Amino acid sequence: MRIALVGTRGVPARYGGFETAVEEIGKRLAAGGHEVTVYCRRPRGSRDASLPAEYLGMRLVVLPAVRARAAETLTHTGLSVAHLCRHGTDAAFVFNAANAPLLPLLRAARIPVATHVDGLEWKRAKWSGAGRRYYRLAESLAVRWSDALIADAQGIADYYRRAFRAPTVQIAYGAPVLDPGAARLGELGLTPGGYHLVVARFEPENNVLTIVEGYRRSGAELPLVVVGSAPYAHEYTASVHAAADGRVRFLGGVWDQDLLDQLYAGAVTYLHGHSVGGTNPSLLRAIGVGAPVIAFDVDFNREVVRTAGRYFANAAQVATLVDEAEADVDATAARGKAGLGEAARYDWDEVADQYESLARRLGQLRSSGRRPSGRRSRRGDE
């Protein structure tokens, strides 16, 4: 089959969950004999497409985008959809419900499409007013114009059922189970079990500020290592830095996956503040190397870590949990081992098989069939 993956920054995966999913799923589909095309954004600062024509068996189509928060995704996906409509494919996977206004073009080209709806983007603090209204409208359009909807967590599936009476295909991400070692931690002046870790974009709904404030209130002897940044959140980033004390180390973005895996594996705890997405790849990566997890208390995180995790809702609880982790390192390490057991439920091979099965169903479509209207039910704002 010809399968197109549209709506992300593309591969090689350097940025977020969608890109990791595209790489892990796409390379497996390609290895299975499918012709996989991945639409990629032109790297920043490059007039020429500096990506290869092929990567891990996937064909790459590199296109530009307007570098602005409100326009980057949609402009790149618009160019990708135009290219795809000219060249055709048997099935398309569009990532991010924000791209839903472009779905009618794919339908007009008779390309069956499944939309991965992502999390509840309209709840993110960076969107207000028109931006928030746009994301809520985009959810409705995705329901109306997709041949299938993909949810990566039960909570997301429940939301679409409640808000739109719309069925979804539930496919999570994978959690690679790794033993990355610790040979490179010395490059950062770190030792295994000698630090707490945060990995997140600096955005309010990821609760990096809450974690840093809570850590500062704690009596922790081990440093807090913070990995991440945000290209459009300068004010929030400044507030995070202002909240830190001398025990907090900011590393910025770490794009070296081997080094990042060693950071996860060597952490005495991994603090995870994400609150509005679905199944989060950073959380899966952490449990896959046995990092003990302290997570923000929402159903998406509890669905992944279950009883192996500890959960917080505010800075005071972060302080308590960090102190408890250092006070009983054996119990903390045992929770990390329990998390490894949960990681076994998230297997990239199984995820890719589910995408392949859905692609085959899409490819067999003769007509769009009856889709939900896209109208919100009265309970849809919950």
Q: Which residue ranges define each predicted feature?
A:
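Acidic donor-binding loop of glycosyltransferase active sites
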Residues: Q262-G278, A291
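Nucleotide-activated donor-binding/catalytic signature segment of Leloir-type glycosyltransferases, i.e.
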Residues: T237-D258
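Membrane-proximal helix-turn-helix segments that form the acceptor-binding/catalytic region
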Residues: G131-L149
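An aromatic- and histidine-rich active-site surface loop
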Residues: E72-C85, T89-D118, W122, G278
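Conserved donor-binding/catalytic core segment of Leloir-type glycosyltransferases
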Residues: A4, E187-R217, V225
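A charged, aromatic-enriched C-terminal amphipathic alpha-helix characteristic of glycosyltransferases
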Residues: G32, D330-R360
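N-terminal strand-loop element at the rim of the active site
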Residues: T8-Y15, R28-A68, G155-A157, R161, ...
